[in-house]
């Protein structure tokens, strides 16, 4: 149980983060090294893995970080559970763009975990999520957009949702989504599950 005053405080923090998100075109075609970060749980332990992958060769290296997680799962506040561990797992990894398992600005306060991490690290991030958290789906020119209060905040390709975190734009998300679910996130997911079992 999380006290109401703490959630209200965290909402204010999220609004502050959202005001500091920079939406600008990055250019997926310019990315030579891409990072992905994911997390798995066993009890109250979180197993986070950051993967850095060379786009051309497919070669990758990774870092893992294990830590205790005491904040409960509350939709819209995922960053409190996962961001600290994810940031530790990607420290020192070499990449141009970070993909985060979670939402960017396709979030009720436009401050999903990919936006939080992107702003805190001042780094280009895209959120890739498995389910919709907020907004309405609208099909336009063969692309499914996520609209929030009349604004396009994300896109859906297959069963995945892509939204800008920081220093990227919707076109970057579209270009990424057209390529299918990112391999670097598949690797991160596989490694979190493997490390959790060890």
Curated annotation (Swiss-Prot):
GO molecular function, one term: deoxyribonuclease V activity
GO cellular component terms, A-Z: cytoplasm
Coarse class of the protein's main subcellular location: cytoplasm
Annotated Mg(2+) binding sites: 38, 101
A Pfam family this chain is assigned to: Endonuclease_5
InterPro entries referenced in this protein's UniProt entry, alphabetically: Endonuclease-V (IPR007581)
Enzyme class: hydrolase
GO BP terms: DNA repair
Location(s), subcellular: Cytoplasm
EC number: 3.1.21.7
Cofactor dependency: Mg(2+)
Keyword Coiled coil among UniProt keywords: no
Catalysed transformations (reactions): Endonucleolytic cleavage at apurinic or apyrimidinic sites to products with a 5'-phosphate
UniProt keyword list: Cytoplasm, DNA damage, DNA repair, Endonuclease, Hydrolase, Magnesium, Metal-binding, Nuclease
Swiss-Prot/TrEMBL site (Interaction with target DNA) positions: 73
Family, as annotated: Belongs to the endonuclease V family.
Protein's job: DNA repair enzyme involved in the repair of deaminated bases. Selectively cleaves double-stranded DNA at the second phosphodiester bond 3' to a deoxyinosine leaving behind the intact lesion on the nicked DNA.
Protein name: Endonuclease V
Origin species: Saccharolobus solfataricus (strain ATCC 35092 / DSM 1617 / JCM 11322 / P2) (Sulfolobus solfataricus)
